[in-house]
UniProtKB/Swiss-Prot annotation:
Example of a GO biological process term: immune response
Highest taxon of the lineage: Eukaryota
Region Framework-4, residue ranges: 103-112
Residue ranges, annotated region (Complementarity-determining-1): 24-38
Stretches the record annotates as Framework-1: 1-23
Renumbered residue ranges of the record's region Complementarity-determining-3: 93-102
UniProt region (Framework-3), positions on chain: 61-92
PROSITE patterns from the UniProt entry: IG_LIKE
Keywords annotated in UniProt: Adaptive immunity, Disulfide bond, Immunity, Immunoglobulin
Keyword Disulfide bond appears in the UniProt entry: yes
Protein name, UniProt field: Ig kappa chain V-III region PC 7132
Cross-referenced SUPFAM superfamilies: Immunoglobulin
Gene Ontology cellular component list: immunoglobulin complex
Length: 112
C-alpha cells in the first residue's frame, strides 16, 4: 500500500495568514499525467469534505483561499488567508492505488 506521511501534525496560524500542510507519499501517485492526490477537511461530528482533487483542482463550492500543489510524491495544501471557519482536521488521500484509499495521519489546524 502507498503510505502517506503528513506534516505537521498540528498547526496554529493567525487569522489572515497562510497555513501550509505537506503530504509525502511512499511512492509516486502520478499516472496518465494526473496526480491522484486529494485533500479533505473534517470538522467534529461531520463527514469529510473534499477540498482538492487531483492535486490542484478545487472541489465544488470550495473557497478560493484553498489551493493545492505538487506532483509525484510531494504535495501541499495552502490556506490563505486563514479564517476562523478553517479550524478543522485536514487529511491528504491518495486515489492512485485502490483499494485502499489510503489517508495521511491528519493535521489539526487551529487559530493562533
Amino acid at each position: 500500500d502507498i503510505v502517506l506521511t503528513q506534516s505537521p501534525a498540528s498547526l496554529a496560524v493567525s487569522l489572515g495568514q497562510r497555513a501550509t500542510i505537506s503530504c509525502r507519499a511512499s511512492e509516486s501517485v502520478d499516472n496518465y499525467g494526473i496526480s491522484f492526490m486529494n485533500w479533505f477537511q473534517q470538522k467534529p461530528g461531520q463527514p469529510p469534505k473534499l477540498l482538492i482533487y487531483a492535486a490542484s483542482n478545487q472541489g465544488s463550492g470550495v473557497p478560493a483561499r484553498f489551493s493545492g500543489s505538487g506532483s509525484g510524491t510531494d504535495f501541499s495544501l495552502n490556506i490563505h488567508p486563514m479564517e476562523e471557519d478553517d479550524t478543522a482536521m485536514y487529511f491528504c488521500q491518495q486515489s492512485k492505488e485502490v483499494p485502499p484509499y489510503t489517508f495521511g495521519g491528519g493535521t489539526k489546524l487551529e487559530i493562533k
